[in-house]
Amino acid sequence: AAPSQTTLYQSYPNPFNPEVWIPYELAKDSPISIDIYTPAGERVRTLDIGMKPTGRYIDKDFAAYWDGRTATGERVASGIYFYVFRTVDYVGSGKMVIVK
């Protein structure tokens, strides 16, 4: 059965180095984007996931993926990062830690 509500889950592994997956469930078809921020509020990357159909995106083959790099391709520093997940009718956020 399709998910009854859109849900964002904790990224894994957490802490991570250098890559991380962000699992979620979608209650309806939607374009998805994920912005990744430093604790100071600086956006380091936007993941434009694109249009996704209703479903569960939990394991590594389906969850959103971040390679731990900035928009310009540089590896981010160790520390805490926040992710903001957006669909047409849902916004969720989470915290993840990169340890090198």
Language model segments and positions:
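Glycine-centered coil/turn sites that cap beta-strands in beta-rich domains
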Residues: 1-12, 16-40, 46-49
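Beta-strand secondary-structure signal
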Residues: 9, 21-23, 33, 63-65, ...
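Aromatic side chains
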Residues: 12, 16, 24, 37, ...
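C-terminal tail/sorting-segment detector
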Residues: 23, 74-100
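Glycine-centered tight-turn motifs at strand-turn-strand junctions
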Residues: 28-31, 43-76, 87-92
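Residue-level signal for short segments within beta-strands and strand-turn junctions
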Residues: 36-40, 70, 98-100
